[in-house]
Every structure is written in structure tokens, then in C-alpha cells.
Amino acid sequence: MGYYAIFAVVLPFLWTCFYLLKLNPTSKLTSTIRLPPGPRPLPIIGNLHQLGERPHRTLANLAKVYGPIISLKFGSITTIAVSSADVAKEMFQKHDLALASRKVPAAVRANGHDNFSVAWLPVTPKWRFLRKISAIQLFSTQRLDARQSLRQAKVVELLDYIKARSNAGEPVDIGEAAFTTSLNLLSNTFFSMDLASYSSAASGEFKELVWKIMEEIGKPNLADCFPLVGFISRMSVNRELMGYGNKLNEVFAEIIEKRLSAANSSEGRGNGDVLDTLLRIMEEDDSELSLDDIMHLLMDFFTAGTDTTSSTLEWAMTELLHNPEKMAKAQAELEQVLGKDTVSIQESDIAKLLYLQATVKETLRMHPPTVFLLPRKADSDIDLYGHLVPKNAQVFVNLWAISYDPSTWENPDLFSPERFLDQDIDMKGQDFGFIPFGAGRRICPGLTLAYRMLNLMLGTLIHVFNWKLGDGLSREDLDMTDKFGITIQKAKPLRAIPILK
């Protein structure tokens, strides 16, 4: 049943609920300050009719009218949208704990993912435990440094694939190639095995599967807007989402089952990868880690860790092809620092490649991995930037709006890596005009790995090859349109022809 058909069925019931609801007693704070300004909501549906297909742009435009913090109604849900660096700074520095909980979409609740996911759990002892495992076993400097050779090997495989395409004069689907590299890097880190190859359709199928999950979670849903009507959840949450999640879980379950069987046989476990570590922790006496925790942890990292990296790399290559003078500057720096004959870029080289780093950062500014940070929920009434954020309101931080705010960025619509050379801008949650991976206690734990991989892959692609568009297309013909989900991908995949230097 489609979205509007469902709405027509439940509208009379919602109308009745609207008049039967009782207002909660007002707190002292609610009697002294008001909600942020915003467009007048309609009865029942609120401001849902105004969102459109690109809600990040809609909310950014509304911020130009009503200010950097606005209030809306998504059905019955009070929603606060933060659209400036100043408001984000106050939010994360002053109210991070009060806004640390998540507003969990119905799509995430569909298979109970919110009960196990480090991305969606509230800040509880369980969340801290899972976060600690992620920080120590995956993303600590020691662990990242120990796996440099693995990342290098995966980039070399990417290089070999593109060389073969170059020799054949065939174009490369940049996003799909980057996705395969990211997927195999993660699968080798966790499982000591590849999950896809550049020559098979498996990578594209896995990429489509991950995108479907991200798309379903990111799009509006009636169950999120009218939580009092519980049966809508079963009607309006796309049932296909359960199928997508189950397909991923089947892959993980088979790998785990084989690993557990090997541990009980004469072969032993002995891979020394992340899965071995997680299973060992699970088997300890009084362990807090369960098999369900491991399955959902894998779901988190294999969706977020593959899609965001590959999408960002695709946008970086798109921007460089669209701005050939920037491509030339990045290539000149690589040649100067590494030399013409050096093919393999090491992670230790990245610190010397300032323009390359600036290019990655500018891509993250213009095309943030998520246009909205995952939604927060107010655990109490708070005063944010002189306005009331009421208890249980959901709060969206519009990274896209912040990234294109002219009060923070000069000429924000221009792709200009130079802006990151002129000033020292940190992306670890301290410079609030540039928080592509979030800020505060819920900042993305994988940001350091993502940043290393983006520089390594992009540097390799443009140092070893020149690139051109196929079919006689010029840079003016490049399609820069995006499509909305939790991540923003190119609406039309980038296909470019590599030319070996």
C-alpha cells in the first residue's frame, strides 16, 4: 500500500486522536521561553507537505527565512532543525548529554536493530561497552597502524583493476570500484576474506543492498510522524527493508557459524581478525557481549563503513573532473612530493600532501557523508540559542545547510580546496562549521579510518592516471544531481576512462 493510500485510510482516525490528545503540564522552562520560529503547521500533518524530495535543501531554505534554529511539526512530532555552526556549537558544548539520545525511525525498529546498535542505542552502560569495543578493537591508533599493510594491499588491488580497464580503454564506475575496495577492506579486517571482486556482480549487488537500507531508513515514514497509531508501523514501514537486512545477516551468520565450527574442531580459530576477538570476548565468563550484539555491530559497520566512503570518493572524483584546474594542482603536488615514478602511495605520505587533504576536506564539506546527523531526542526541556527545545522533541543537525552557510564559508557553492589551506580546520568535532562525522560523545568512531582511506584511494587514482569522460562528454556535461537518503549519492553514477600516465 502506497504512502498516500495509507494516509487516506488512517486520516479519520488521526483527526480523532488530534482532538482527544491532552497537553502535558508545562515546565518552568516552557513558561519562560518559546519554541524557535518556523512555518505554520497544518492540522494533523504539520509541515510534512513542505519537505519535498530533498528535505536538506528545503530546511536550509527555511532557515534563510526563519533563522538558524527553526521548529516544525512532522505529523505530531515536534522537530527542531539546527542550520548554523553557532547553534551547533552551543548544542554540542552545552547540551550534548541532554541531546545524546536518538529519535529512532520505525525502519530501524523493524528488526530490533535499535536494541543492539551502537549507532542507535541511548547512552547507557551497554552503549558505552559497545563503543569501547569499537574504539579499542577497530579504531585505536595502534589498531589502525597495525593494519596499514592490509589497506595498502586493497588499494593495490584497486590499482590493478583500473590498469586493466585503462589498457582496454574502458570506463570505470568510480563509486562501484570504491565500494568494492571499502567492502573488501572491512571484510578482511573482520573476517580475513574478500566479500566481492571487481570482476563479479557481487559488489554491485551488495552496494545496491546497502543503499536500499540507507534509503529506507532515511526517507519519511508515517510511523515516525504519528507514533500513537502503532499499527501504522506495520503498514507503512517498507517490508522490503526486513528482506534487505535479512540478506546481510545471512552473510554474516554463515561466516560466524563456520568460524565457531572451526574453533571446535582441530583447525582451531587462529585468524587473529576482529571476528576472532569479538567471539573471544563473547565466550568470556560474565561477558556482556552476545551473538546478537556482534551481528548488529557488523550491520552498523558494513552499511556505514562502505557506503559513506565510496560515495565521498565518487563525489571527489566528480568535483575534480568538473574543475580540471583543481585536478591539475592535486596531481602536481603528488608528483612533486612522491616523484613521477612512484606508484604506491603510503599512509605516511599523506601528511605531506596538503592539497590532497584539502581536496578531501572540501569534498566532505560540499557532500557530507550524511546531510543530517542521525536524529537526536531531547531527554528534558532545554534552552538552545534562546529557544525552547521541549522534552521528547527530535533534533536534526542539517550538515548540508551548515556547509553552505555564507556566514561561515565564503562562496560556499564553489569547489575550492584552497579554503582549507588558508586556515587550520579540524574535522574531529571542534570546528562546528565542519563536522562531517558529527561531534560530541556520539561522533563517528570510524572517522580516522575513513579519512585515511579517502586520501589513500583518491591520491592513488589521480597520481597514477589521468581521467576523461566517455561518449564525448565535457566537464560542463557532468551530472551533479544528488539523491536523498541517509547518505547523499550521485543520482547518476560517475563513469570515467582512466589513462595510465
Swiss-Prot record:
The keyword Repeat does not apply. It is a single-pass membrane protein. It comes from the Eukaryota. Pathway: Aromatic compound metabolism; Alkaloid biosynthesis. The chain crosses the membrane at residues 1-21. Its main location: membrane. It is an enzyme of class 1 (oxidoreductase). Signal peptide: none annotated. Heme binds at residue 444. Glycans are attached at residues 115, 264. It catalyses: tyramine + reduced [NADPH--hemoprotein reductase] + O2 = dopamine + oxidized [NADPH--hemoprotein reductase] + H2O + H(+); 3-methoxytyramine + reduced [NADPH--hemoprotein reductase] + O2 = 3,4-dihydroxy-5-methoxyphenethylamine + oxidized [NADPH--hemoprotein reductase] + H2O + H(+). Its cofactor is heme. An heterologous biosynthetic pathway of mescaline is reconstructed in Nicotiana benthamiana plants and yeast cells expressing Lophophora williamsii genes TyDC2, CYP76AD131, OMT1 and OMT11, thus providing a sustainable production of phenylethylamine-derivated natural products. Its EC number is 1.14.-.-. Highly expressed in aerial parts, in both skin and flesh tissues. Keywords: Alkaloid metabolism, Glycoprotein, Iron, Membrane, Metal-binding, Oxidoreductase, Transmembrane, Transmembrane helix. It is found in: Membrane. Cytochrome P450 monooxygenase participating in the biosynthesis of natural products derived from phenylethylamine, including mescaline, a natural hallucinogen potentially used in psychotherapeutic treatments. Catalyzes the hydroxylation of tyramine to dopamine and of 3-methoxytyramine to 3,4-dihydroxy-5-methoxyphenethylamine. Belongs to the cytochrome P450 family. This is Cytochrome P450 monooxygenase 76AD131. It comes from Lophophora williamsii.
